[in-house]
Every structure is written in C-alpha cells, then in structure tokens.
C-alpha cells in the first residue's frame, strides 16, 4: 500500500480528479453565464415592449377622446332607454 502512495499513482489520480472538477466547473459557469445574459436581453426587450405599449395606449386614448361624440346628445337617448329596460325587468320573474 505504501508503494502505491509513493509511486505517484495517487498524485496522478488526484490531478485527474481536479482537472475533471475544473472542466465541469467551467462548463457550469459557461451555461449559467449564458442563461443570465439571455435573461438580461429578454428583460431589456420586455421593457422596450412595455414602453411601446404605454405610448400606444396614450395615443389610443387621445384618438378616442378626439373621436368622442358630444355629451349633450347622449342624455336624450339615455333617458328613453330606461323605459325599455324597465319593461324588460317587469317581464322577468324574480327568483
């Protein structure tokens, strides 16, 4: 047993194990770093998309406000509709 330790086989095995651990560690670091950079790119794209959607919503609000009909015409039509709604409610039996 003492001959195996002194012959250098043990140091060679130790060197091989440390090299394997180093290669596995570098591979893990590569994939974690790659995933992190892709996640950062996706976050940047999502933030840009959010900014564009906010601008589109603001533009849509302005367009809707510009195309909105005058409010004086609405109360006249709204006053006649509740009578029809009341007739329908009277026909439906309560449970």
Swiss-Prot record:
Protein name: Uncharacterized protein YebO
Lineage top rank: taxon: Bacteria
Transmembrane residue ranges: 12-32
Principal location class: membrane
Intracellular or extracellular location(s): Cell membrane
Membrane topology note: Single-pass membrane protein
Keywords noted in UniProt: Cell membrane, Membrane, Transmembrane, Transmembrane helix
Location of region: Disordered: 66-87
GO CC annotation: plasma membrane
Xref: Pfam families: YebO (PF13974)
Organism phylogeny: Bacteria, Pseudomonadati, Pseudomonadota, Gammaproteobacteria, Enterobacterales
């Amino acid at each position: 047993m003492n001959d195996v330790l002194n012959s250098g086989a043990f140091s060679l095995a130790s060197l091989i194990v440390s090299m394997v651990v180093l290669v596995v560690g570098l591979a893990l670091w590569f994939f974690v770093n790659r995933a992190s950079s892709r996640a950062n790119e996706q976050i940047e794209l999502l933030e840009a998309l959010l900014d564009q959607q906010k601008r589109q919503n603001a533009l849509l609000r302005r367009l809707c406000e510009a195309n909105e009909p005058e409010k004086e015409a609405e109360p006249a039509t709204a006053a006649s509709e509740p009578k029809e709604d009341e007739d329908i409610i009277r026909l439906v039996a309560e449970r």
